[in-house]
UniProtKB/Swiss-Prot annotation:
SUPFAM superfamilies: Ribosomal protein S8 (SSF56047). It comes from Saccharomyces cerevisiae (strain ATCC 204508 / S288c). GO terms for molecular function: structural constituent of ribosome. The gene is MRPS8. This is Small ribosomal subunit protein uS8m. Component of the mitochondrial ribosome (mitoribosome), a dedicated translation machinery responsible for the synthesis of mitochondrial genome-encoded proteins, including at least some of the essential transmembrane subunits of the mitochondrial respiratory chain. The mitoribosomes are attached to the mitochondrial inner membrane and translation products are cotranslationally integrated into the membrane.
Length: 155
C-alpha cells in the first residue's frame, strides 16, 4: 500500500471540500476503495460510485485489466450548515516513518491518552487503521482485537 497515494487522496478531498465541490473523482484502487468506503460508512461522504474519467456509470461496467486505467471512484462530499463535514484529513503514518500500534495502545488512544505523539481521538473524528491489508476504523480494529498501522485522522 502506498501512503503517498493515500496522502494525495486526503489532500484532494480536503481541497475539494474547502471549495464546496459536490462530486469529485479519485483513482480506482483497492486502497482508495477501502478508504472511501470507510469515510462513507462513518458519514463523511454522501455517495460513492464507480465510474470512468467522464463521470459516474449509469450502468454496471466490470473492471478489467483492459479498462482499469479509465476507472475512477466518484465521491460525493457532504456539507452541513454550509460547512464541509470533511474539514481535515491528515496522515499519521508517513511513508518514511510508519506507526504500528498494538491493540492495547489503540484502546488507550480511544480513551484519551496520547500514544507516541498521536493525540487522542476526539468526538467527530475518525482514525483509520490498516490491519491484515484491510482499512478499518480504529474502534472496529479494537473490537476485532487486531494490531495495525495507524494511517490517518479525519475530522
Amino acid at each position: 500500500m502506498s501512503l503517498v497515494k493515500l496522502a494525495n487522496t486526503c489532500a484532494h478531498l480536503q481541497n475539494c471540500s474547502k471549495v464546496r465541490v459536490a462530486l469529485t473523482s479519485i483513482p480506482y484502487t483497492k486502497l482508495q476503495l477501502q478508504f472511501a468506503y470507510n469515510l462513507y460508512q462513518q458519514g463523511f461522504l454522501s455517495s460513492l460510485q464507480k465510474g470512468s474519467t467522464m463521470g459516474p456509470d449509469k450502468d454496471f461496467v466490470e473492471v478489467t485489466p483492459d479498462n482499469i486505467s479509465t476507472r475512477r471512484l466518484w465521491v460525493g462530499l457532504k456539507y452541513r450548515d454550509n460547512k464541509p463535514v470533511l474539514s481535515s484529513c491528515k496522515l499519521i503514518s508517513k511513508p518514511n516513518s510508519r506507526i504500528h500500534l498494538p491493540m492495547e495502545d489503540m484502546k488507550k488512544l480511544c480513551s484519551g491518552v496520547t500514544i507516541r505523539n498521536i493525540k487522542p481521538l476526539q468526538p467527530g473524528e475518525l482514525i483509520l487503521v490498516r490491519a491484515h491489508n484491510n482499512i478499518m476504523d480504529i474502534n472496529e480494529a479494537i473490537s476485532k482485537k487486531l494490531d495495525g498501522e495507524v494511517l490517518c485522522r479525519v475530522k
